A protein has these predicted regions:
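Residues that form generic nucleotide/phosphate-binding pockets
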Residues: 105, 136, 188, 192
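Beta/alpha (TIM)-barrel catalytic core signal, keyed to glycine-rich beta->alpha loops juxtaposed to Asp/Glu
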Residues: 1-119, 123-128, 132-135, 142-157, ...
Length: 194
């Protein structure tokens, strides 16, 4: 065939339909690599989450690789400790303790994790770049990429930044199917990224 490999977003909270897509690809001899497996990477907001040597990155990696149709995981790593952490996840089966940790995390971030579905963004009368702003805030808060995030935010045309969100009715909140406080998060992101 024409394609030998593709990459898709996949995590343990959303994208349930991805498994079927990956399976259909595998049946046609197409390999799948996945990324964004950590579902927002917000574990530092939940200090009791990672116990007994378990880590969210390792559990999420094992979860993704437990799907026989997933060939590889793409993960951002910025130091050797992270490389060791991810390598420690490979070749080991996903255990019950990890499944339980992933479920606790999923429950904790359900209304905090942006799935980038775009529904809230389309409800915004000011055309604020909600998905981009959420992504840059995530990079700032959870990936240690403060300078990059601020640069990226500064590249958004001013009228699409969150500078007006404080005076808004919050159509984005009402539109979010996951109950996120989108407006509040955008205001916080604006303060953080300017």
């Amino acid at each position: 065939g024409r394609f030998h490999f593709f990459i898709g977003r996949y995590d343990f909270i959303s994208y349930a339909n991805q498994a079927e897509i990956f399976h259909r690809a595998a049946e046609k001899g197409i390999g799948t690599a996945v990324f964004k497996i950590r579902a927002g990477n917000q574990q530092k907001d939940f200090p009791d989450l990672e116990k007994e040597g378990l880590t969210l990155p390792q559990a999420a990696t094992r979860w993704a690789l437990s799907n026989p149709d997933v060939c590889s995981v793409c993960a951002a790593m910025t130091n050797f400790d992270q490389i060791k952490e991810y390598c420690g996840a490979v070749g080991k089966k996903l255990g019950q303790a990890e499944i339980e940790m992933l479920q606790r995390y999923a429950d904790a971030v359900y209304d905090k994790y942006c799935r980038n579905c775009g529904i809230c963004e389309s409800a915004c009368p000011d055309r604020v770049a909600v998905a981009d702003i959420n992504r840059y805030a995530m990079y700032f808060k959870y990936y240690g990429r403060e300078k990059d995030s601020m640069k990226l935010y500064a590249s958004i045309p001013r009228e699409q930044t969150a500078f007006r969100c404080g005076d808004c009715a919050g159509n984005c909140d009402a539109a979010c199917p996951y109950g996120r406080k989108v407006r509040e998060e955008l205001i916080e992101a604006h303060r953080m990224l300017i």
